[in-house]
Structure formats: structure tokens, C-alpha cells
């Protein structure tokens, strides 16, 4: 069975859309405001005061969208994607016309075609979001055609239970909900100097005291640090036994990742949220530069 059509469709979620402003987002399904807006969160732009207050002040507010792939018999697959209009244009104007007519079951071939189509301008960044949206929708379609859940098509369940953790600063709520692990967003980065560093340390110390020794703690740094700051903070936080420290460095700086790995070999490092495609993961795994993807 062949692919009949591929199209991007806008989906409307609370607080999204072309006119939605970050400071106006309403999280109607949450008990409390999102941690992204509840206070300072260190990020690559916090060195600039006008964007230091909170992360959504500079990140895109493009509307969410989805991708629908329809087969010749009318069966359809669906997936969601981020970064709205720019990615939707890549889907509709570039990738979709070149995939129509391919087999609905040829997931590997279609993926390879999309990666290769990125050669003129790079297969990472926004192009990778378009690839992912079509790839996921194609897997959804494949599962419907074969009448099997996608996890079975990928080899079946690998485990009976999944390790789950919370993210944010509302620790008392997370403990009330029964989480045994929680990840804190790091509020301050190098631009905040010694005072910010000390506040980061105090946050972890206070949280460890609150949750006790049997709850895992992690720290999300969202690409905000340089190597020196990352090493210094990791050394200060060593007594609090963090399960991992996440995304301390800019994603593309592999030399910095290598330096960090050498200087704090005792600390579990996690990253990969902002790596796109397979190449960065292959590179990092072959060194190895980090412990967790």
C-alpha cells in the first residue's frame, strides 16, 4: 500500500497559537503554574539581562501542529511536532511531495530519504523536526495497517516497569504524588557570578534535606554553562549525590563535553535533548562523552 498524501495540520492546545505570548500561557490541566514560568531558569540567553528573567521570554511561540499521512485505502497515521510554521513548511513544501507514492511500510527507506534530502542545508535543526513528525506519523500508519501496536513492531516491551521522575521546583507536591526521583531546573548560570552559584548550591542542599536520602535528585542545566562553571558547580554539589547532571553545555560543543567528562569522571552526565539525527549520538557514544542520552 502506498502513501497517498502527507500534510501538516494545526492543532490547538491551551496557551498556544500564533498570537500566544509566553507570559500569558495558561496551563489549565496543571495544579500549579509550569516550572518554566515559575522562576529563573538558567539557559543559553541568561547572560543577556533582557532575557534573563525566564526562559520563554526568548524561545519561539510558534503554534503546535501535527502531521497526517493517508494511505491509498484511507487509513491514516498522525504525529505531533514543535516549531509550527517553519517546520510545517518543510513538511508540506519539501518532504511530502517527494515521499508520496512510497510504500507505507517502508519506514527505514523514507527516513533515509528525508535525511538525504537535508543535504543541501543540513539535516539537523528544523529539518530534523520535520523528519521526526513524518517518521512518527508513518510508524503510526504502519501499526494501523498491520493491526499491531508500534512497540511490538519495534521489538516488543523491553521491561515491565519504567523509572519515572518529576521536573520542577514544586518538590513538596511531587513527593505528595509519590515520585521517588525529581529533577530541579538550575536557576542560575555563569552570568550570575558567585551569588548565583551559591544560590544553586543552597537550592540543592535544601531540596536534599527536604526529600531525604532515599529520593533521587537530578539537575537540569539546559545548556547554560561553560566547562569551568560546570566543574565548579559539580564539585560543590558532590556531597548531595545527584543521580545525574543534565545538559550543562551547549549541545554542539563536543570539545567542551570531552573536557567536562575528563574533569568530573565521578559525576553521571546526561545530554542529547538538543542533538538531532544519529550522528551526534554515535560520536558521543564512541568516546564516550556522556553516560545517559
Residue ranges of model-derived segments:
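Short catalytic-loop micro-motif centered on adjacent basic/acidic residues
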Residues: 78, 217-220, 243-247, 269-271, ...
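Active-site phosphate/pyrophosphate- and oxyanion-stabilizing loops and adjacent acidic/basic residues
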Residues: 140, 152, 205, 258, ...
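Conserved, mostly hydrophobic/aromatic
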Residues: 3, 74, 95, 134, ...
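Metal- or metallocofactor-binding catalytic centers and their adjacent structured scaffolds
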Residues: 22, 45, 54-55, 70-145
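Catalytic alpha/beta core domains of metabolic enzymes, predominantly
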Residues: 252-293
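Metal-dependent enolase-superfamily TIM-barrel catalytic cores that perform enediolate-based chemistry
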Residues: 155-264
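Structured beta-strand/loop patches that form or line metal/cofactor-binding pockets in enzymes
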Residues: 1-72, 79-82
Amino acid at each position: 500500500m502506498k502513501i497517498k498524501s502527507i500534510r501538516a495540520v494545526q492543532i490547538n492546545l491551551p496557551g498556544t497559537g500564533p498570537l500566544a505570548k509566553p507570559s500569558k500561557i495558561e496551563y489549565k490541566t496543571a495544579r500549579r503554574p509550569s516550572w518554566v514560568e515559575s522562576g529563573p531558569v538558567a539557559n543559553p540567553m541568561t547572560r543577556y539581562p533582557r532575557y534573563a528573567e525566564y526562559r520563554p521570554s526568548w524561545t519561539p511561540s510558534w503554534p503546535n501542529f501535527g502531521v497526517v499521512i493517508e494511505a491509498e485505502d484511507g487509513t491514516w497515521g498522525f504525529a505531533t511536532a514543535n516549531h509550527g510554521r517553519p517546520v510545517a513548511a518543510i513538511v508540506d513544501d519539501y518532504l511530502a511531495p517527494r515521499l508520496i507514492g512510497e510504500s507505507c511500510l517502508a519506514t527505514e527507506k523514507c527516513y533515509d530519504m528525508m535525511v538525504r534530502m537535508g543535504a543541501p542545508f543540513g539535516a539537523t535543526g528544523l529539518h530534523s523536526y520535520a523528519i521526526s513528525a513524518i517518521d512518527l506519523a508513518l510508524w503510526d500508519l504502519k501499526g494501523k495497517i498491520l493491526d499491531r501496536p508500534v512497540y511490538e513492531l519495534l521489538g516488543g516491551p523491553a521491561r515491565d516497569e519504567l523509572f519515572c521522575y518529576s521536573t520542577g521546583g514544586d518538590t513538596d507536591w511531587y513527593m505528595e504524588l509519590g515520585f521517588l526521583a525529581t529533577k530541579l531546573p538550575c536557576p542560575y548560570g555563569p552570568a550570575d557570578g558567585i551569588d548565583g552559584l551559591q544560590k544553586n548550591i543552597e537550592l540543592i542542599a535544601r531540596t536534599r534535606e527536604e526529600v531525604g536520602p532515599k529520593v533521587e535528585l537530578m539537575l537540569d542545566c539546559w545548556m547554560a554553562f561553560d566547562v569551568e562553571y560546570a566543574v565548579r558547580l559539580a564539585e560543590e554539589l558532590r556531597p548531595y549525590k545527584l543521580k545525574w547532571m543534565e545538559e550543562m553545555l551547549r549541545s554542539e560543543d563536543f570539545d567542551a563535553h570531552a573536557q567536562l567528562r575528563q574533569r568530573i569522571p565521578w559525576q553521571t552526565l546526561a545530554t542529547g535533548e538538543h542533538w538531532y539525527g544519529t550522528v551526534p549520538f554515535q560520536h558521543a557514544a564512541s568516546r564516550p562523552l556522556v553516560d545517559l542520552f
